[in-house]
């Protein structure tokens, strides 16, 4: 996490929580000539457009006051979606028994990408049950090797 996203998260966390929402993710990116601050929020039962509008208004107020970003940017407040990223320990624990997509920095058992059911989570590793063609394989992955992990929708 960059210093900008850390600072934004510290500023926005209390605002989002005061509205009864959970701050799921903060992303600050440059796309072409424009900068985007993307904030994902959630709550039990899910987020709707009015929740996003309210959070956007309150976040915008505090961001204008604190001014942690020097460049002009677009603020985008949204739901994390069905394929939400797993960022916090709580996210990992809540995902046990669900399908996840894992992208790795380096291959594990010959692959850098895995989709499977998250079986176990520890401080240092995760365990997946992945289907490979017609058989199921249990894979243990060191968490330091994980570049990205999110829920996966399996149809």
From Swiss-Prot:
TM region positions: none
Entry's Gene Ontology cellular component terms: cytosol
InterPro entries membership: Ribosome_maturation_RimP (IPR003728), RimP_C (IPR028998), RimP_C_sf (IPR036847), RimP_N (IPR028989), RimP_N_sf (IPR035956)
SUPFAM superfamilies hit by this protein: YhbC-like, C-terminal domain (SSF74942), YhbC-like, N-terminal domain (SSF75420)
Domain of life where this protein originates: Bacteria
Family: Belongs to the RimP family.
Summary of the function given for this chain in its UniProt record: Required for maturation of 30S ribosomal subunits.
Protein name: Ribosome maturation factor RimP
Annotated organism of origin: Macrococcus caseolyticus (strain JCSC5402)
Originating gene: rimP
């Amino acid at each position: 996490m960059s210093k900008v996203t850390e600072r934004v998260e510290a500023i926005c966390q209390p605002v989002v929580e005061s509205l009864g929402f959970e701050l799921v993710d903060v992303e600050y990116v440059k796309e072409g000539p424009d900068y985007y601050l993307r904030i994902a929020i959630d709550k039990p039962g899910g987020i709707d457009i009015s929740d996003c509008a309210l959070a956007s208004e309150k976040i915008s107020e505090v961001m204008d006051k604190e001014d942690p970003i020097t460049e002009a940017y677009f603020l985008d407040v949204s739901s994390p979606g069905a394929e939400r990223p797993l960022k916090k320990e709580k996210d990992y624990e809540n995902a046990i028994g669900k399908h996840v997509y894992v992208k790795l920095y380096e291959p594990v058992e010959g692959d850098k990408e895995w989709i499977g059911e998250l079986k176990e989570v520890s401080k240092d590793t995760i365990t997946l049950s992945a289907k490979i063609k017609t058989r199921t394989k249990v894979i243990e992955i060191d968490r330091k090797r994980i570049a990205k992990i999110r829920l996966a929708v399996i149809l």
